[in-house]
Amino acid sequence: MKKEMQERYILGIDQGGTKTAAAVMRGDGFIVGQALARGAYFPNEGMESAAAAMQEAVEGALKSAAVDCEDIELTVAGIGGVDWPGDDAAVKGALQERLSLGEIFVCNDAVIAFYSGTLRSHGAVICAGTGMNGALIDREGRQFVYGDYMEEKAQGGSALARRAARKVFDAELGLCPPTKLTQLFLGQAEVPDVDTLLKRYMTEDAFRKELRFLVPQILMVAESGDAVACGLIVEFAEEIADYIEAGFRKMKMNPEEEEVVLAGSVFKGMENPLTKQVVKRMGERFAGAKVMQVHYEPVVGACIMGLIRLQMEPSEREKAIRESASVLGLCYG
């Protein structure tokens, strides 16, 4: 029986604009191969380009694991851009055309991020990097992905940076107190005053986009006690908590019985002021809700989701998952 379990293989795929990752997990929880390829976002680049990147990553992972496509019992693919009915079927078809894989399950990449933070089958995840997305999975396996229900002002690091810039302009106008954010943004723009900063902000699209790289410093300003930056973080955390609460309500899930996973660079570190505020807001609203950060790269979450779909309890394989992910550099922290 033990040999049979070890000979069952799950293939996990994670694709976003930055990279495409693939990993092979054995039935006993050990990750035995992985590979990376270029990133792709099929709504912008086309399915052929995205599928080619997936094929490259999958073939590399299979080679690393010394297994063939025919050895894979289940493939779980978390793909950025799977937002609308039919997108999953299109990705599945593109994979089947290129690779001799058996059963394939395709979902939005936010879904696999949930399983990179918990070994439970149900709960919620909020992913905040350059943008923001999230998903909920109930006890029956039904999914809800926020997608475009999350408005522009909530779009992760990009939105937080734009809102911080607005606080600088508000401070200059006298709508809020002076803030250390002003010097941060003047330094980034390499300009002497807020008037010149405002001109760059309003007329240079590339400059507005590069402001997202200031997110770590914005969080540091808040951590230093700057009242304006702290207020901004509290507002942002409150809105994130609103989305989480609304999602639970929509899915008719009891938040006090669920786990909420925070994923993405904007939430990095439990001492991160934004992370602390989200944890605080959720604790105030739902006494039993447990908020945690991701433990693994999303591709590991795809494999863990595969275990659950094959009714192979992940918690019984936790040690193997953790140790093999650590060896392969797939762990956070």
Model-derived features with residue positions:
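Cell-envelope/extracellular polymer assembly enzymes that use nucleotide-activated donors
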Residues: 73
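Flexible, active-site-adjacent loop/turn segments at secondary-structure boundaries
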Residues: 80, 144, 149, 199-200, ...
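Glycine-rich beta-strand-to-loop/alpha-helix junction loops that act as flexible
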Residues: 76-82, 128-130, 258-268
